[in-house]
Amino acid sequence: QYINGQLVDVALVGSVEIKPSVSKILVKGDKYIPNVADLSYWAWPTKKPYTITTYYQYRWGAFHAAIDIYVGFGSPIYAANNGTIADVGSGCVRGDTKCNNGRGNYIIINHNIGGYYTQYMHLNSINVRKGQTVSRGQKIATMGNTGYVVPTPAYGSSSYAGTHLDFGVWIGVPYGGGTHINPFSLY
């Protein structure tokens, strides 16, 4: 009913159900994460500021096929780009220099384009699982000192000795026929 052009009273004369209601949540917080890297932009794998303790170079008579980055024990490690977790090595404790062939706790990400892989070694904790899709900048682990690190966190010394991230970039599967490249070539 209208009075002087204003609606003043409404009466429901009927209703039609267009779509039945659903009494459950069908989708909660779904976000599509592409598993293919954007080769034009790579995220740095640690927070800043950081210190490079070893470069991609020869040392101690052998080639070091990665860069060692120090921020601090337990600091976050981030995926350098989108991809799929290709391998995870875990179960290592500080001081076990042979665990996972000296790599300690580690993650390898397949970036699913151009054969690019990144490796993250000597981790304290791991936040991902094999087969999981990750996005650039996503926290995947924390910095640690597992596996063969120098100085070794030996009994009676600092339990944080040798803390760093060994960050490597490969074209092809790391340690499986791939070729390592200088990580700085991406930045």
Task: Show where each model-derived region lies.
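Generic structural signal for well-ordered beta-strand positions
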Residues: 8-9, 86, 140
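Acidic, glycine-rich catalytic/binding loops that coordinate metals and/or anionic ligands
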Residues: 14, 40-44, 126-138, 142, ...
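A generic structural motif
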Residues: 2-3, 70, 110-112, 170-172
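Zn2+-dependent peptidoglycan hydrolase active-site motif and core
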Residues: 64-66, 79-127, 146-165
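Well-ordered beta-sheet/strand-loop patches within structured domains
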Residues: 1-56, 63
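Generic structural motif
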Residues: 44-54, 75-87, 134-137
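Short, small/polar residue-rich loop motifs at catalytic or cofactor-binding pockets
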Residues: 72-73, 127
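Bulky hydrophobic/aromatic "packing anchor" residues in well-ordered structure
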Residues: 51-53, 69, 183
